[in-house]
Each structure stands twice: as structure tokens, then as C-alpha cells.
Swiss-Prot record:
Keywords: Calcium, Complement alternate pathway, Complement pathway, Cytolysis, Disulfide bond, EGF-like domain, Glycoprotein, Immunity, Innate immunity, Membrane, Membrane attack complex, Metal-binding, Repeat, Secreted, Signal, Target cell membrane, Target membrane, Transmembrane, Transmembrane beta strand
Ranges of residues in domain EGF-like: 501-531
GO cellular component term of the entry, any: extracellular region
Disulfide bonding pattern of the chain: C59-C94, C70-C104, C73-C112, C118-C129, C123-C142, C136-C151, C158-C196, C374-C399, C499-C547, C501-C517, C504-C519, C521-C530, C554-C587
Subcellular locations according to the entry: Secreted; Target cell membrane
Residue intervals of the TSP type-1 domain: 58-113, 542-588
Quaternary state and interactors: Heterotrimer of 3 chains: alpha (C8A), beta (C8B) and gamma (C8G); the alpha and gamma chains are disulfide bonded. Component of the membrane attack complex (MAC), composed of complement C5b, C6, C7, C8A, C8B, C8G and multiple copies of the pore-forming subunit C9.
Protein name stated in the entry: Complement component C8 beta chain
Lineage of origin: Eukaryota, Metazoa, Chordata, Craniata, Vertebrata
Length: 588
């Protein structure tokens, strides 16, 4: 492990303000590049085998559900349709509207009581209940300014001016755990409840929003290099997935379909490109050296209770029918994501993976451990590579020659087959420099470390499901609403999971985009099902989960379900499925 510290003097006030600017933070924009010897083993494009033929699958939509009963509060009834079969391999797509409502009459004997009794001031438009002392205080505590109407004298809310946390509103957005996209605002992080409680960061006064328990900025940044070597693709992928799963803690109540691909945004071309390169290396003849650096700059934590919801999100939840109608509840998850962020660490992350050809490596005097040691030396800030020694007999035992090989374009006969560089956080200049090098220089790493302060990103986060934001403070029928939202989340994740797609050939990844399944093919493989290749090497196939089976009947207030690792079955040394095969949860 090697560490480089960024001096406190470098963290001036402007950089602090900028690096907490989360306008660029929370939409993870990972820069990724790869390069390698694409011409090796190239021949005329062909199908890998005569058996690998793909047949178009047409999209199929279910019939309309029955109309729901007339909702007392909304005076509407609803119906919906679901995706029965996504299209794949060039099949006919679906063009449809999957939810409808129409006006209906409610008998006079029924009354609407969706808003709980307010013992303070009930805001006119948003329906928010605030303390009466917040009226006429010069701030929009209601979210519609109704608490400031008719005020004769409006005092200043705080005696001293205070800065607002830059980008704090972005942390209030929901997040879709299937693709890591940030969606609509679910929390109001510009609500202060009249408090002027200050927080000082390097002598600058910040005003703490009501929803926040903690927002801490580091006054000194540092990053560590962790260098690992892996004998095989399966070893590397197993380690990578375990690392990724520890970066996002998800409370959900039941497992996530397709957890092996959890959190990847396959709509991001740069993310897709890195996956294509790594999965191409699933043959048995590849080894890996991975170096990872992390720079943590800030921590964010919500309070545990009494959260103030964003007015629009509050109104959307209150407009849901009291009876369970999947189509209406599904739309909440489409618009606002599935979860909200309760804790986050902000900063930067850099991962550099070198893909080695084991057959060529065996013909040299180098070992996998030599590559690991020299990579570690080459990434050490200020390191003297001439002082690091490897296998005896290698040009005096110095890392110099090996690092030169890793730093130049891949040459014929080189053991370095390819590399993948992933950068999160940092300036455009530093990212461009890092992803264009096979082995980054210490100068580029320092430049990236400085850039992270101005443009940090998520490096770890903890999330909880949206339905946990439903409390009796804001909703009359909170128990029913929460139960319906939990049930809808299970249905939504099942309907939107890529497990519904047929397997792609040659270790391609099947991805459900809307109503269409696409195959993300390893580099060197093409076709709608990755069935065409210009390569002769056989690659492994990683296993993937089937969709979850139906929930069992409720017994002892519990129900269970299971799934199989057969979509596809792992073969030729491919990775086994990770995650639960069986699970149980409370009845809902």
C-alpha cells in the first residue's frame, strides 16, 4: 500500500466550495478507456459454431387489467398492462401506453381523508404541515409561500448570512438501484425548519438543512494504492463483484434480480465498453493485475427520522389510489427511482487493470508476481523503479524494462494483451490523461488528485427503499400506502430485470432496455446475440440467474421464493452466480 497526502494548504476555500459542488457529483460519469492488440487471432468473421443461431423474439404486452374500483379521493378508476415478453434479437418492438385512468362517481357516503390532522399550519397547495412559529419568518417553509401570505412584517430568517451547501439538492434525489441513475427529488434539502444552526468549514459559515445529520468535508485528502494479481478471469471477477457490492449497501427487504449485474448503467457507452473488454478476457489463458486508488473528500448522512419530503413527491404519493393498482405505483418508481440515499462518501476512484496473456507470459522470464510488484512500484508517487527488483536475470533485476513494456503500445509478442482504466471524479484534463496511458505517471496521478477536489463523485453509498419515507406524519393511511409500495417494488424489479432476456452467446451480457433486450458483446464478437466472431480463442461463459419464481403462500407471516443459476449456466471456467438462491420476507 502506498499513500500520497494532499497538503492542507492546497485545500483553499474556493476548492472546498467547489468540491462539495454536487451538481457534477451525483450523476456518476465514469471515464473508461481500453486499448489492446485487436489484430491478434483475427480472421474472416464467422459464426462461432453452426449451432449458434439467433431467432428474433417479438415483444408481447399483457391484456389490460380489470378496472379498479373508484378511488374515493381522486375520483378516478385505473387499469394497466405489463410487459409479458421483451423483444430480442431483432424481434418486433412494442409501442404502447401501459396505464389508463378515467373519471368516476363516488357515492356521497364516502369521504376522503388522505391528509392527516395538522396541529400547526396546513400549507395551502403542498399540504405540508409546519409549526405555526414558521409563519411570517421570511422563508418559504411550505414550498408554496402560503406561510408568508398576509404578513405585515417579515424579519430576516437569520442574523448572519450563511452559505448553502453547494449541490445539496442533488443528494435529495431518488436513485434506481437497477442502473444507478438519479431520478426525481424525494427530499427537500432546502427546508431549514427555521433553524440557523451554523456549521463552520475553514471559517466559512454554512447553514445546515433540517434533513441533514452530518455533512463533513475533509481538510486533507489522501489516496491509497491497492494492487492485486489474479491467476484467472473467474478470480478477478469474483473479487471485483465483491468489491462493488460493498460500495453500495442496499436495504430492500428482498433480493435484487440479477444481482451479479447490480448497479451497472449499461446505457452509458463508456461503462459498456469496459465490460466488453473484461468479458472478452474470460478465456482460460488470461491473468490480471489490478491497481485501485481511492480519494475520499466528504461524508453525507441523513437524519434518521422526521425527514421533510419534497412537495411534489409528497403530492404524488398522496394522489396514489388507496387500493393497490400496480400501474400507478409502478410509475412512482419510474419517476423517482427505487431508493433514496441515506449516507454517502464523496471523492474519486481510479482503477487500472492490466490483462496478461498467460501463454506468452510463460515464455518470458517474468512472473505474474513480477507484474504486480512493478505495477505497484510504477504507481508509487516519487518511486525509484531502479531500486525495485524482480526475477533474477532480468536485465539486472530492475522493473525498468517491464514498466516500459506496460507503458508503451502493446507490441507483437508482448505479454500485456490489453488494459482497462476506469476513472470516477476529477477534472477533464486529468481524466483524459489517465485513460490514455497504459500505466499512468505519478504526475498524472497528482493532477487527478487535485481535480477530484473540484469534481468529486460517489465512491460509497447506503440506500433505503422509497417506501420507508412513508410515515404517519404525512399520510393518513401510512401502513396501507407503505404495504402497497413494497408490493409494487417487488413487481417493478421483476418486470424491469434483465433476467427476462434470453442468454447471449459467447459471454455477452443481456440487458433489458425498456421493452427490448440487447446483447452487450465482448470485444471481437458481434451479431444480435454475439454469435459472430473474428477470434479463434474459446472464452468462458459466466452464469446468470433466472428470474425469481413466484412467492409462496403466506405462512407464519412469511413467504419465500427461489431462482436458478441457468440463464445461462456457467461453463468453460466461467463465473458462478453470486447472491441468494432462496430468500424469504414478511408477507405483504
Amino acid at each position: 500500500m502506498f499513500r500520497v497526502a494532499i497538503p492542507r494548504s492546497a485545500l483553499n476555500l474556493h476548492s472546498c466550495l467547489l468540491h462539495v459542488t454536487l451538481s457534477l457529483v451525483l450523476i456518476s460519469k465514469a471515464a473508461i478507456t481500453t486499448a489492446g492488440n485487436e489484430d491478434s487471432d483475427v480472421r474472416e468473421a464467422r459464426s462461432v459454431s453452426d449451432q449458434q443461431v439467433v431467432h428474433p423474439v417479438d415483444c408481447v404486452i399483457s391484456d389490460w387489467s380489470a378496472w379498479s374500483r373508484c378511488d374515493t379521493c381522486q375520483k378516478k378508476r385505473y387499469r394497466y398492462a405489463k410487459l409479458d415478453q421483451p423483444s430480442q434479437f431483432g424481434g418486433e418492438p412494442c409501442h404502447f401506453h401501459d396505464m389508463e385512468d378515467e373519471a368516476c362517481d363516488v357515492p356521497d357516503r364516502y369521504t376522503c381523508d388522505s391528509i392527516p390532522l395538522c396541529e400547526g399550519f396546513l400549507c395551502t397547495q403542498t399540504g405540508r404541515c409546519i409549526h405555526r412559529t414558521l409563519q411570517c419568518n421570511g422563508e418559504d417553509d411550505c414550498g408554496d409561500m402560503s406561510d408568508e401570505v398576509g404578513c405585515k412584517k417579515v424579519p430576516k430568517p437569520c442574523r448572519q448570512e450563511a452559505e448553502e451547501y453547494w449541490g445539496i439538492e442533488n443528494l435529495a434525489k431518488g436513485i434506481n438501484i437497477l442502473n444507478s441513475n438519479l431520478e426525481g427529488l424525494v427530499l427537500d434539502n432546502r427546508y431549514y425548519a427555521g433553524s440557523c444552526l451554523p456549521q463552520y468549514i475553514q471559517d466559512v459559515r454554512f447553514r445546515k438543512p433540517h434533513n441533514l445529520q452530518q455533512y463533513t468535508l475533509e481538510t486533507k485528502g489522501s489516496y491509497d494504492f491497492n494492487v492485486q494479481s489474479f491467476e484467472s478471469y473467474s478470480d478477478y471477477m469474483d473479487y471485483s463483484m465483491r468489491e462493488r457490492m460493498t460500495q453500495t449497501i442496499v436495504s430492500i427487504g428482498f433480493a435484487i434480480p440479477g444481482i451479479a449485474e447490480f448497479g451497472f448503467n449499461y446505457n452509458n457507452a463508456k461503462v459498456t465498453r469496459s465490460i466488453q473488454k473484461i468479458r472478452r478476457a474470460s478465456s482460460k489463458i488470461n491473468s490480471f493485475v489490478s491497481a485501485k486508488a481511492e480519494l475520499e473528500l466528504a461524508q453525507y448522512m441523513l437524519r434518521s427520522d422526521d425527514l421533510m419530503l419534497h412537495p411534489e413527491f409528497l403530492q404524488r404519493l398522496r394522489s396514489l389510489p388507496q387500493a393497490y393498482v400496480y400501474g400507478e405505483y409502478r410509475q412512482i418508481y419510474r419517476d423517482y427511482g427505487t431508493h433514496y440515499i441515506t449516507e454517502a462518501a464523496l471523492g474519486g476512484e481510479y482503477e487500472h487493470t492490466i490483462i496478461l496473456d498467460k501463454e506468452k507470459l510463460a515464455k518470458t522470464d517474468y512472473s505474474l508476481e513480477d507484474y504486480k510488484s512493478c505495477t505497484q512500484a510504477g504507481l508509487k508517487i516519487g518511486a525509484n523503479i531502479y531500486g525495485v527488483y524482480v526475477s533474477a536475470g532480468i536485465e539486472g533485476g530492475s522493473c525498468n524494462g517491464l514498466l516500459n513494456e506496460m507503458g508503451e503500445d502493446t507490441a507483437i509478442g508482448s505479454s500485456v494483451e490489453d488494459f482497462v482504466a476506469v476513472v470516477r471524479g476529477g477534472s477533464s484534463e486529468s481524466i483524459t490523461g489517465l485513460v490514455s496511458k497504459k500505466l499512468p505517471t505519478p504526475q498524472l496521478m497528482r493532477l487527478w488528485g487535485e481535480g477530484v477536489r473540484f469534481n468529486p463523485d460517489f465512491i460509497r453509498k447506503t440506500t433505503r427503499p422509497l417506501y420507508e419515507l412513508v410515515t404517519s406524519k404525512d399520510f393518513s393511511h401510512d401502513a396501507t400506502l407503505k404495504r402497497n409500495l413494497k408490493r409494487a417494488l417487488s413487481e417493478y424489479l421483476a418486470e424491469s430485470s434483465s433476467c427476462r432476456c434470453a442468454p447471449c452467446h459467447n459471454n455477452g451480457v443481456a440487458v433489458l432496455r425498456g421493452t427490448r433486450c440487447d446483447c452487450v458483446c465482448p470485444t471481437g464478437y458481434t451479431g444480435r446475440g454475439c454469435e459472430i466472431t473474428q477470434r479463434k480463442k474459446q472464452i468462458a461463459t459466466d452464469g446468470s440467474w433466472s428470474c425469481w419464481g413466484a412467492w409462496s403462500s403466506c405462512s407464519g407471516r412469511k413467504m419465500s421464493r427461489s431462482r436458478q443459476c441457468n440463464n445461462p449456466v456457467p461453463s468453460d471456467g466461467g463465473l458462478a452466480c453470486r447472491g441468494l438462491q432462496q430468500e424469504s420476507t414478511d408477507c405483504f
